[in-house]
Amino acid sequence: MDVMKLDHDSVLKELERITSKAAEVQDNILRGILERNKDTEYLSKYMNGSKDVLEFKRAVPIIIYKDIYPYIQRIANGEDSSLITGHSITEILCSSGTSAGEPKLMPTIPEDLDRRTFLYNLIIPIVNKYITGLDKGKAMYLNFVKAETSTPCGLPIRAVLTSYYKSKHFQCRPYDPFNDLTSPIQTILCEDSNQSMYCQLLAGLIHRHKVMRLGAVFASAFLRAISYLEKKWSQLCEDIRTGSLNPMITDPGCQMAMSCLLMSPNPELASEIEEICGRSSWKGILCQLWPKAKFIEAVVTGSMAQYIPALEFFSQGKIPLVCPMYASSETYFGVNVEPLSKPSDVVFTLLPNMCYFEFIPLGKNGTLSFDLDDDEQVPCDKVVDLVNVKLGRYYELVVTTFAGLYRYRIGDVLQVAGFYNGAPQFRFICRRNVVLSIDLDKTNEEDLHRSITLAKKKLGSNAFLAEYTSYADTSSVPGHYVLFWEIQGHLEPKLMEECCVAVEEELDYIYRQCRTKERSIGALEIRVVKPGTFEKLMDLIISQGGSFNQYKTPRCVKSNSATFKLLNGHVMASFFSPRDPTWVP
């Protein structure tokens, strides 16, 4: 199947086919992986050349990154791809990092691009079923690449999105009026994120009356663009007014591309934009700058959910948020077939043709319980197949890919929310390996996010929580949780103390027991950092090799890290919980 030639009807028919025959498709995927990869060093160690599915499930262990990393490292150093796959590994993908901030190197093969492209090609046809007229204008969808490095043997190391944007699948894709980007391809491929952002925003403003949808991969990237626009709108307007590009743009590709858009001065358009951007409040600014925009496309689940209030502020709640897909550097997973669902209700239909899926049950009787350590060996008979998951239950995702990951624990916790034909739909809950822990307590990303979401309401109307991360401070006895908050607006000490209390009240039973009865955890602390600190944090992480396009704020940091030092160096106020949280034996 040539995924680049599938029209909207064909790709939707294929979605129906693979989800209606999910069990059959999954069986074929696993058999195909074993047929091609049975002679690899990794599989031979467990299966002795067998391609039997039952033998695979009996003998091949369920692993985490540290188990497969030595093989990836050997390939990076020049050994043959046959260590783990029967295909040629052509790139190493550098993950954006989990919410814990740990990047990983993942093998990829050429046909992986076909699978990613198939998923991308589903998004607009699905959305078009609910939102019409997208072919009547353009999409201001902000894409970015980052400079690549290489392994000792010369394999490129790229972010997964950089890999896609540099591929023929993106650059040579057929024209689609439903997916006509405002950004010239040269601006997307510019490795200087500052110049790329400037030019892409300039292009979006030039086409402001044609833009039908807005977006970026992650909500954080889109909000970064708004922040950038707040600083640069005057210069952007000057470019439009004079018909000439700001001299700060030195990238030849950007210069050439933008010269085609800045053909002549347009003082009328510049004045329109100046009037809007010069207003005292930017509430609803997206509706005013791009009046025809019908939705904002971005990932707003998991750690991105905290950006929903900011997006709703800038859109005045008038532009729907569409969270289209669920993917990672390891493999792509699924799509949202109900794009207009509320962000809190988003579920993803896992696509059976992406890889072979398995699931580790978590907890009992449908409850969420992290009763399995990240590095604990999982019995082979504990996992269940894609089509055998149970409604309402929680699972950890496990994948087997053509590129050489076998029964690999992704680390994501999902809840079964329903079924689309024969394929289960999942709600993303959290990254299971992100925890704060002082004593017996274990606070995961979801618990932390929920607690902060409720607590920040105490700030009132004069302050706004812009960003946060956390840290388990064990330098004192007892240790305590520290939250770094960046707040826009007026700080009131009493309200900040109330926020500390509110966070603790929402943390789990064990935390409150340790805090109140056992006294093994000290009072929670909120350290308020200076405005712009989290932008500096992102700049730091990107300078260390992170991807701008895929950046996620780390939800916890370590005391000996550069990120912690940066955050702690920008603290301007500190507040502690003034009382113990409620705990009933």
From Swiss-Prot:
Recorded superkingdom: Eukaryota
One example GO MF annotation: ligase activity
UniProt xrefs under InterPro entries: GH3, GH3_C, GH3_M
EC identifiers of the protein: 6.3.2.-
One Pfam match: GH3
Keywords: Ligase
Protein induction: Not induced by auxin.
Gene Ontology CC entries for this record: chloroplast envelope
Class of the enzyme per the UniProt entry, highest EC level: ligase
Keyword presence, Ligase: yes
Protein role: Catalyzes the synthesis of indole-3-acetic acid (IAA)-amino acid conjugates, providing a mechanism for the plant to cope with the presence of excess auxin.
Protein family (similarity comment): Belongs to the IAA-amido conjugating enzyme family.
Protein name: Putative indole-3-acetic acid-amido synthetase GH3.9
Organism of this sequence: Arabidopsis thaliana (Mouse-ear cress)
Gene (UniProt): GH3.9
